[in-house]
Design a protein with these regions (language model features):
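Long amphipathic alpha-helical segments
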Residues: 1-48
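Conserved mid-sequence domains
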Residues: 35, 39-138
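Short, conserved loop/helix-junction motifs that constitute active-site signature segments
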Residues: 139-144
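Peripheral docking tails and interdomain loops at the edges
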Residues: 147-184
């Protein structure tokens, strides 16, 4: 199932945007195609198998433009038996109290600290990646060694952003995550 996400769904998203930007489709057609993709992701999610208790991932989008990509990633992780906590577009949560909210969330969903916890952040802006990376690292410093931060999106050389992995391709993120889990 993850091949459907990585080889069909994800490559389709920029093509739809390109068709819209080039004026070949209108806003309603763009919305229709995006809706079809969202429904496809939901169908894949509902056909996923049971998750393994030690494989945990929190997936979020730092902006609305990355929401479908984060949902596709959640579907791909579920198809590989990960326990997925997809929290969607968190751009409205960018404030000074976010790290406190994150600690509270982690204490509820990863009580036993069993296995591995990967926090996967998608963003089309460096600012979004930097904010969430900084917040997660403030929490990570006081937590277990089996928590990892993964970034996917636009990163440049101007801004220093901390991450255990920064990768544009979901296939690379999935492979790295599974390898990390196998090595704990």
């Amino acid at each position: 199932m993850d091949k459907i996400v990585t080889e069909i769904i994800l490559p389709t998203l920029p093509q739809i945007q390109k068709l819209f930007d080039d004026g070949k489709i209108g806003k309603s057609e763009q919305q229709l195609m995006t809706g079809i993709i969202a429904n496809s992701i939901l169908m894949i999610t509902h056909h996923s198998s049971k998750s393994e208790s030690g494989k945990n991932v929190i997936i979020l989008s730092a902006d609305s433009e990355s929401l479908l990509i984060s949902e596709a990633a959640a579907s791909a992780f579920r198809s590989q038996n990960w326990n997925v906590f997809s929290i969607g577009d968190m751009s409205s949560a960018i404030d000074v109290l976010f790290d406190l909210e994150l600690r509270k969330l982690l204490s509820k969903i990863w009580k036993s600290k069993e296995g591995i916890m990967i926090i996967l952040i998608f963003s089309q802006s460096e600012e979004g990646l930097k904010f969430f990376s900084d917040s997660f690292y403030s929490v990570k410093e006081n937590s277990e060694n089996n928590m990892f931060i993964v970034l996917s999106g636009k990163t440049g050389k101007k801004v220093k952003i901390k991450a255990d992995l920064s990768a544009p391709k979901l296939e690379d993120i999935l492979q790295w995550s599974n390898t990390k889990y196998e090595n704990i």
